[in-house]
Every structure is written in structure tokens, then in C-alpha cells.
């Protein structure tokens, strides 16, 4: 049904160490011509080398992209770099990094991941996500602009959209701005 609706990819995920449990699901998705993006949740459960080994198994079973998930938001920038570096040395598919802001380090972790070769940085508008949130998209864009990257993304239009459309829509639905700041 997803393929009939023009879905181009589906994201699968499991806790680090449980990747083999999704091989069959990935194969079924691929049979329908849909790309598989895989989330290595709670990546810190394994060493960088063990996670890279799991990513290689996923790649061998047709996964098109893997994302290292700092699910608890407790990694440090050096950890982010080590995980990305280990995966980039082991697989040919794109490697992403997803970080939470529980320690206030999402920007530092994202920069470290990017410096060590991450192809994709997950982020959320206004940092929206569970717990203390994710790397805010607007911050990611600003940081990339400082490096001369992602210049096709208009930061000011993004900020205008958030201010004029997203925040009012959220408040209309009862989502208060202070909840955004404290992660309720």
C-alpha cells in the first residue's frame, strides 16, 4: 500500500544489537521498490566497533541508510565522532546522526558527527522531540551556513515560517511555548 501511494522510503529501527530482527522486514520493503532507512536506537548500548559491525550486516541485507541514535541524549561530542567514524569506515551507505539535547550538547554533537563524516544530521523544527528535544533545525542551518554549507536553505524564511505559522498553530492546539523550552 505504501508503494502504491508513492512512498519513497520507510524508516525501520530497533535498539542497537537487535538489527538482525529487522532483516526480513527490510527485504519485504525493498521488494516493493521502497528504500529502507534504519535507526540504530540507543546506539550507546554497543561500542562504536560493534555498532559498525551491525551496520555492515544491515547494509548487506539491503538497508539504504543508517542513523546513529543518541536516544537518551547522553553522548558527548567525542562519542558522536567515534561512532560516525567507525560506521563510515565499515559501510558505503549514508550514515546519519540523531542527537537529543538532554545535556545541552546537541549542537556540539552534531558538529562532531558532521566533522567525522556524517552524511545526514537529524533535527527538528524548534528542536521538537521527546525529552529535552533534538537539534533545532534552525540552529543546524545557521551552523552549516557558518561553514559555507546548506546555503540553498533560507534561514530567515525558516525562522519566519516558525514565527508566523508553526508557533501560532502549535499554540492554537494547546501546545504552549514554555513546554517547548523545558521539554514537557
PLM segments and residue spans:
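Catalytic cores and adjacent flexible loops of soluble metabolic enzymes
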Residues: 1-184
